[in-house]
Amino acid sequence: MNNFPEIFDDESTCDYDKEIDHQELSDTFWCLMDFISSKHGKSVADINSGMNTLINIRKSLNGSGKVVSITDSYNKTYFHSQRGLTNVDSRINIDILKIDFISIIDDLQIIFRGLIYKDKGFLDSADLLDLDKKTTTRKFQEYFNILKIKIIEKIGMTKTFHFNIDFRNTISPLDKQRKCSISSSHKKTNRLNDLNNYITYLNDNIVLTFRWKGVGFGGLSLNDIKI
Protein backbone atom coordinates (compact mmCIF):
# COMPACT_ATOMS: atom_id res chain seq x y z
CA MET A 1 0.00 0.00 0.00
CA ASN A 2 2.99 2.25 0.46
CA ASN A 3 3.53 3.86 -2.92
CA PHE A 4 6.35 6.14 -1.84
CA PRO A 5 9.49 4.07 -1.21
CA GLU A 6 11.58 7.11 -2.14
CA ILE A 7 10.41 8.78 1.06
CA PHE A 8 10.51 5.85 3.40
CA ASP A 9 13.64 4.01 2.36
CA ASP A 10 15.26 3.09 5.67
CA GLU A 11 18.61 2.72 3.93
CA SER A 12 18.68 6.32 2.77
CA THR A 13 21.72 8.31 3.83
CA CYS A 14 22.50 11.94 4.46
CA ASP A 15 25.33 14.11 3.25
CA TYR A 16 26.67 15.17 6.63
CA ASP A 17 29.19 17.49 5.02
CA LYS A 18 26.41 19.71 3.77
CA GLU A 19 25.79 22.73 5.98
CA ILE A 20 22.23 22.63 7.26
CA ASP A 21 20.05 25.70 6.89
CA HIS A 22 18.08 25.77 10.14
CA GLN A 23 15.69 28.36 8.76
CA GLU A 24 14.94 26.01 5.88
CA LEU A 25 14.35 23.21 8.35
CA SER A 26 11.89 25.29 10.35
CA ASP A 27 10.13 26.45 7.20
CA THR A 28 9.88 22.83 6.11
CA PHE A 29 8.27 21.89 9.40
CA TRP A 30 5.66 24.62 9.11
CA CYS A 31 5.07 23.68 5.49
CA LEU A 32 4.39 20.08 6.46
CA MET A 33 2.12 21.06 9.32
CA ASP A 34 0.16 23.47 7.13
CA PHE A 35 -0.27 20.73 4.54
CA ILE A 36 -1.53 18.21 7.08
CA SER A 37 -3.80 20.86 8.59
CA SER A 38 -5.36 21.55 5.21
CA LYS A 39 -6.24 17.86 4.97
CA HIS A 40 -7.84 17.71 8.42
CA GLY A 41 -11.34 16.28 8.25
CA LYS A 42 -10.76 14.68 4.86
CA SER A 43 -10.08 11.06 4.07
CA VAL A 44 -6.58 9.67 4.29
CA ALA A 45 -6.84 8.95 0.58
CA ASP A 46 -6.80 12.73 0.09
CA ILE A 47 -3.60 12.92 2.10
CA ASN A 48 -2.23 10.20 -0.17
CA SER A 49 -2.71 12.50 -3.16
CA GLY A 50 -0.53 15.13 -1.50
CA MET A 51 2.47 12.93 -0.79
CA ASN A 52 4.45 14.63 -3.56
CA THR A 53 4.69 17.51 -1.10
CA LEU A 54 6.57 15.22 1.26
CA ILE A 55 8.87 14.10 -1.55
CA ASN A 56 9.83 17.73 -2.13
CA ILE A 57 10.29 18.28 1.60
CA ARG A 58 12.55 15.25 1.79
CA LYS A 59 14.67 16.53 -1.08
CA SER A 60 14.95 19.96 0.52
CA LEU A 61 16.33 18.25 3.63
CA ASN A 62 18.95 16.48 1.51
CA GLY A 63 17.14 13.18 1.59
CA SER A 64 16.86 12.89 5.35
CA GLY A 65 13.21 13.49 6.15
CA LYS A 66 10.35 11.06 6.53
CA VAL A 67 6.96 10.89 8.15
CA VAL A 68 6.92 8.22 10.82
CA SER A 69 3.27 7.95 11.72
CA ILE A 70 -0.12 9.63 11.73
CA THR A 71 -2.36 8.58 14.62
CA ASP A 72 -5.40 9.99 16.36
CA SER A 73 -6.15 10.50 20.04
CA TYR A 74 -7.32 6.91 20.31
CA ASN A 75 -4.01 5.72 18.83
CA LYS A 76 -5.78 4.62 15.68
CA THR A 77 -3.14 4.56 12.96
CA TYR A 78 -3.86 6.28 9.66
CA PHE A 79 -0.33 6.12 8.38
CA HIS A 80 2.86 4.30 9.34
CA SER A 81 6.22 4.43 7.58
CA GLN A 82 6.55 0.65 7.49
CA ARG A 83 2.92 -0.30 6.93
CA GLY A 84 1.95 2.52 4.61
CA LEU A 85 -1.50 4.10 4.58
CA THR A 86 -4.19 2.33 6.61
CA ASN A 87 -7.89 2.93 7.19
CA VAL A 88 -8.03 4.73 3.86
CA ASP A 89 -11.82 4.89 3.93
CA SER A 90 -11.90 6.44 7.39
CA ARG A 91 -12.53 10.08 8.15
CA ILE A 92 -9.97 11.97 10.18
CA ASN A 93 -12.44 13.52 12.56
CA ILE A 94 -11.38 12.24 15.97
CA ASP A 95 -10.39 14.74 18.66
CA ILE A 96 -6.66 15.01 18.07
CA LEU A 97 -4.45 13.97 15.18
CA LYS A 98 -0.75 13.55 15.91
CA ILE A 99 1.87 13.95 13.19
CA ASP A 100 5.48 12.86 13.63
CA PHE A 101 8.08 14.11 11.17
CA ILE A 102 11.72 13.09 11.41
CA SER A 103 14.83 14.69 9.98
CA ILE A 104 18.37 13.55 10.62
CA ILE A 105 20.91 16.34 10.96
CA ASP A 106 24.52 15.80 11.91
CA ASP A 107 23.63 12.52 13.66
CA LEU A 108 20.76 14.26 15.47
CA GLN A 109 17.39 12.65 14.92
CA ILE A 110 14.83 15.44 15.24
CA ILE A 111 11.20 14.47 15.74
CA PHE A 112 8.61 17.18 15.16
CA ARG A 113 5.15 16.48 16.55
CA GLY A 114 2.13 18.60 15.74
CA LEU A 115 -1.39 18.28 17.08
CA ILE A 116 -4.56 18.92 15.11
CA TYR A 117 -7.71 19.61 17.12
CA LYS A 118 -11.09 18.82 15.59
CA ASP A 119 -12.81 21.94 16.88
CA LYS A 120 -9.96 24.41 16.41
CA GLY A 121 -7.97 23.01 13.54
CA PHE A 122 -4.20 22.79 13.73
CA LEU A 123 -2.62 24.49 16.75
CA ASP A 124 1.06 25.27 16.53
CA SER A 125 3.26 27.04 19.05
CA ALA A 126 2.29 30.44 17.63
CA ASP A 127 -1.37 29.74 18.41
CA LEU A 128 -0.65 28.40 21.87
CA LEU A 129 1.74 31.13 22.94
CA ASP A 130 0.03 33.99 21.10
CA LEU A 131 3.20 34.80 19.20
CA ASP A 132 3.72 35.31 15.53
CA LYS A 133 5.08 32.26 13.76
CA LYS A 134 8.42 33.85 12.91
CA THR A 135 9.13 34.76 16.54
CA THR A 136 8.22 31.28 17.75
CA THR A 137 10.36 29.63 15.10
CA ARG A 138 13.32 31.82 15.99
CA LYS A 139 13.01 30.93 19.68
CA PHE A 140 12.92 27.27 18.79
CA GLN A 141 16.02 27.67 16.62
CA GLU A 142 17.90 29.46 19.38
CA TYR A 143 16.98 26.81 21.92
CA PHE A 144 17.94 23.97 19.61
CA ASN A 145 21.26 25.52 18.60
CA ILE A 146 22.29 26.22 22.21
CA LEU A 147 21.29 22.76 23.34
CA LYS A 148 23.04 21.08 20.43
CA ILE A 149 26.28 22.98 21.04
CA LYS A 150 26.29 22.14 24.75
CA ILE A 151 25.61 18.47 24.13
CA ILE A 152 28.38 18.25 21.54
CA GLU A 153 30.84 20.01 23.83
CA LYS A 154 30.12 17.57 26.65
CA ILE A 155 29.83 14.17 25.01
CA GLY A 156 30.61 14.62 21.34
CA MET A 157 28.65 13.19 18.43
CA THR A 158 29.23 9.50 19.14
CA LYS A 159 25.74 8.71 20.41
CA THR A 160 22.25 8.59 18.94
CA PHE A 161 20.26 11.73 19.76
CA HIS A 162 16.54 12.42 19.69
CA PHE A 163 15.06 15.92 19.92
CA ASN A 164 11.29 16.23 20.24
CA ILE A 165 9.09 19.30 20.06
CA ASP A 166 5.57 18.65 21.29
CA PHE A 167 2.77 21.22 21.20
CA ARG A 168 0.11 20.56 23.85
CA ASN A 169 -3.20 22.13 24.69
CA THR A 170 -2.77 21.44 28.39
CA ILE A 171 0.21 20.67 30.61
CA SER A 172 -0.28 18.40 33.60
CA PRO A 173 0.67 19.64 37.10
CA LEU A 174 3.32 16.92 37.23
CA ASP A 175 4.88 18.19 34.01
CA LYS A 176 4.93 21.72 35.40
CA GLN A 177 6.76 20.51 38.48
CA ARG A 178 9.46 18.97 36.31
CA LYS A 179 9.91 22.23 34.39
CA CYS A 180 13.46 21.42 33.29
CA SER A 181 14.85 18.06 34.27
CA ILE A 182 17.59 15.57 33.57
CA SER A 183 17.11 11.91 34.26
CA SER A 184 18.31 8.50 33.20
CA SER A 185 16.97 5.01 33.58
CA HIS A 186 18.28 1.52 32.91
CA LYS A 187 16.43 -0.43 30.31
CA LYS A 188 15.44 -3.97 31.16
CA THR A 189 18.32 -5.49 29.26
CA ASN A 190 21.37 -7.49 30.14
CA ARG A 191 23.56 -4.49 29.43
CA LEU A 192 23.62 -2.41 32.57
CA ASN A 193 25.11 0.55 30.71
CA ASP A 194 22.27 0.74 28.18
CA LEU A 195 20.79 4.03 29.38
CA ASN A 196 18.07 6.23 28.02
CA ASN A 197 18.93 9.76 29.10
CA TYR A 198 16.62 12.68 28.49
CA ILE A 199 16.15 16.37 29.12
CA THR A 200 12.71 17.96 29.11
CA TYR A 201 12.10 21.69 28.97
CA LEU A 202 8.57 23.05 29.35
CA ASN A 203 7.51 26.54 28.34
CA ASP A 204 3.79 27.12 28.72
CA ASN A 205 2.25 24.78 26.17
CA ILE A 206 5.44 23.60 24.50
CA VAL A 207 7.23 20.44 25.57
CA LEU A 208 10.76 19.95 24.29
CA THR A 209 12.50 16.64 24.91
CA PHE A 210 16.10 15.81 24.11
CA ARG A 211 17.17 12.18 24.57
CA TRP A 212 20.27 10.21 23.82
CA LYS A 213 21.31 6.62 24.31
CA GLY A 214 24.72 5.89 25.74
CA VAL A 215 26.63 5.41 28.93
CA GLY A 216 25.96 8.07 31.54
CA PHE A 217 25.80 11.80 31.01
CA GLY A 218 29.44 12.33 30.11
CA GLY A 219 29.73 15.14 32.63
CA LEU A 220 26.55 16.88 31.46
CA SER A 221 24.70 18.61 34.28
CA LEU A 222 21.45 20.51 34.61
CA ASN A 223 23.34 23.80 34.70
CA ASP A 224 24.73 23.07 31.26
CA ILE A 225 21.35 23.17 29.57
CA LYS A 226 19.54 25.96 31.39
CA ILE A 227 18.93 28.91 29.06
Swiss-Prot record:
<keyword id="KW-1031">Host cell junction</keyword>
<protein>
    <recommendedName>
        <fullName>Protein p26</fullName>
    </recommendedName>
</protein>
<comment type="subunit">
    <text>Self-associates.</text>
</comment>
<dbReference type="InterPro" id="IPR009985">
    <property type="entry name" value="Crinivirus_P26"/>
</dbReference>
<dbReference type="GO" id="GO:0044219">
    <property type="term" value="C:host cell plasmodesma"/>
</dbReference>
<dbReference type="Pfam" id="PF07416">
    <property type="entry name" value="Crinivirus_P26"/>
</dbReference>
